[in-house]
Amino acid sequence: VADWETKRAWLNYAYDEFLQAGYKISSAYTVVKDNSKVNFSYRDNLWQGSDLIATGIASFGHVSGVHYQNKADMKEYQSDLTEHGKLPLGRGYKPTRHQLLVREMILLLKRGYLDVDYFQNKFEVDITQQWSSQFQQHSEDGMLTIEGGRIQLTRKGFLNADALLPVFFEEEHQGIRYT
């Protein structure tokens, strides 16, 4: 298995090749040829807090303000569905409003940018004030820029998108490995 430095080098190479072929970076994980013809409805709606019913083993879902994960063991998952006639729910959690803000912010940051006014209007929070030191550090590290109410990932930021996120987690959620 390749180390992170190698994986980032591969991704950087892939970005260059796609950009030369006329594609644009759409998120830390996607490129598109023509933004006007491509709609990542699933991603964009989910990342902005819409409900999603999880249907696979160990899948995460979000319904009516509750986050949940299906069972991770295949036998238990199948048994719940076929023998017990119930959903294979493994665990669930009702996040606070602040946790919903954090969730939405970190997911949308993977898209490559954040509009500060969006969060002010939806959550009544100025994210540049709430996490000023975190954004400042990421800016100093060359991961993002902050201009005119917009936080924008740099290429370096896209290559390290997932590594940027934990500083925004609540303390009790940092350092946790999720299935």
Features from the language model and the residues they span:
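Short, amphipathic alpha-helical interaction segments positioned at domain boundaries
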Residues: F158-T179
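C-terminal scaffold of the Radical SAM
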Residues: V1-V125, I176-T179
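Short amphipathic alpha-helical interaction segments
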Residues: V125-S139
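A short, conserved structural fragment
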Residues: S139-G149
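Minor-groove-contacting beta-hairpin "wing" of winged helix-turn-helix DNA-binding domains
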Residues: R150-T154
